[in-house]
Amino acid sequence: MNIKQSILKILSDNADKAFSSAELCKLIGTQKTIERQAVKDVLLQLTVERAVLCDAKSGKFRSAKADGTAVFQGNKRGFGFLLIGGGEDLFVAAALTHGAFNGDTVTYRKIPDTRDCAEVLTIVSRGTTTLVGTYDKHNGGRFVVPDDDRFISDVYIPPQKDMNAKHGQKVAVKINVFPSDNRDNPEGEIVAVLGYPGSVDVDMEAVAVSYGLTDVFPQEVEAYAAKQCKLIGEKDLQGRKDLRGQKIFTIDGADAKDLDDAVSVCRNADGTYTLGVHIADVSHYVKPSGEIDKEAFRRGTSVYFPQAVFPMLPHSLCNGVCSLLAGEDRLTLTCQMTIDKKGRVLQSDVFPSVIRSVHRFTYDQVQLILDGDQNARAEFCDVCAELDDMNALAQILADKRDKRGNVDFETKEVQFVFDGGKVVDVVPFKRDFAHRLIEEFMIAANEAVAEYAQTCGLPMVYRVHEKPDEEKLRVLLSIMSGVGIDVKRSKEIHGTVLQDALEKARKTPYFYLINDVMLRTMQKAKYSDTNVGHFGLASNCYCHFTSPIRRYADLVVHRIIKTAVCGKMTEKALAAYEQMASSSATQASAREKIADEAERKADDVCKCSYAETILGQTFVGLISGVVERGVFVELPNTVEGFVSAEKLGAGFVFDKERFCLYNDAVKFGLGDKLCVTVASVNKQACKIDFDLAIEKSQQQSID
């Protein structure tokens, strides 16, 4: 055994102890001066490699055996956190980050005699290799200042690597060299010049690049997709039920192009309904391990920005041959259900099919028909009876889900109005029952497919949603109690408890506030190859089946189900799908998280762009959050800003139980109205600051 191996074995066998170099020499058995020097040289090498740790005070060495692997989250002040999960995030002092940058996956060890402190040992993989920032070129220096202040170092740009970017422009930079510690700058090259900041188009492109989003596909993927865009032939129709004579139609947003679901309904003589949910058969065109499939797996999901879409599949597929366009023959996978008057699914069947949609409806058109608009009903008289039956069935399904404990949150969706590179208005988007109608039908199909897979013992990508964390639930109930809403409590967390709380809140001025806090209390839904149910939907068995154009998880579900219903589920196929379900669930969950973050960021940037147009204007909003350093205020159009405690006045105390700031004269609590003026906007940090518009003593008299 050589010296290096001997040192590592001694330290590994005594992981809780530290040794001086002299002690290690004695244990190894080295006696000569040259041998002792060799031990010291090896210790220095191992310390540089982070295989051995050296205590700065005692000079003793100990094993660098890792306690685990985690993602490092940086902070502009140099320190960081290790995101462990389960509420166990660890603090890393600046001196102990050892070259880790925001987003990196690292190994770490917990520091003895501390509760929540750790040291980074090694970098497993870099989380950020391309970032967006502002080019800073002056006095001979060339650096990119990252937009994300969690990435603590500016990136040095060598000569001839700046693409002739100008000082102050937004650029994308690829990092080629990372330093061994955070005292030096990373080195990179500019790969795209986005333009000068100020235009919302430049801002949106910056968000897209920072999250690695693009609507451009590799040439080989586009070429392969183009080959799929051919007329449906007799071979394509083999083994499919021909539903082209049925009244099947799509209902989507006015701007939607990737129409992946269509519906039909028939009211039977015995009072039951036959509901058909017909989903684009993307699996017919995208084969496992092909070029399109590899790219779709990498992307995981389509991402939607206010003025852009970054699709999972090439446009020739998602907007073309896979999109269920009216009057066009399309290959589909149909889930057909017989449902009784109580919303019970008496029978369900899944089979390959071919359809021809008779109408391409928008939600607004359908809502007009459901509301009895005479012009709309006259224009679409051929399907009014079917839409009326759909309306009745959707009400039945919604009532049934509510009774079993479905928690029906109201999401704050908005539409942005653009003009001249600016956002000039933010308009809250109202969801009417036409949206709920499609939602109910999709949920019914997703449940039926998941239950079929579970009953047959098939591998599956389930959509799971665990119960909320009990501590977060306690905080929620405390907030509700603080605003005078009494909630029944039970030992077992059940959706009916939260549903009851939401209904009580609906009758108060605090509804949207409680709705938002309750949403944050929920666990994040994710994909899994193991079924644990879906808490929010009060469903014991659930999957995503209805959007294979834009979600990779749905595409995998289609492959599994289609193979099974066509009688082709061999042992070899079963084993392959087990592996596919596991890897796809992990990838789809990870990509969904990135997509959600990117979409939120895009919305926040648009709201900041709008806020720049209303600087100095005054509005009345509701306090949506209270922290020790101030209050968050949300305007009626969902734009949120911050009023610092200093602006509220002196002597304020933070009451964390009642979530309010108060002094002898006034109290600022959740849901209170506040008159504010838009003071400043930091678009890069997505932060809006408000000032009080009137004296604090007068705030509570706002009507």
Regions found by a protein language model. Name each.
Residues 1-276, 283-328, 658-669, 675, ...:
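Charge-lined substrate channels and their catalytic hotspots, especially those that engage the 3′ end
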Residues 26, 178-179, 196, 205-213, ...:
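Electropositive polyanion-binding surfaces
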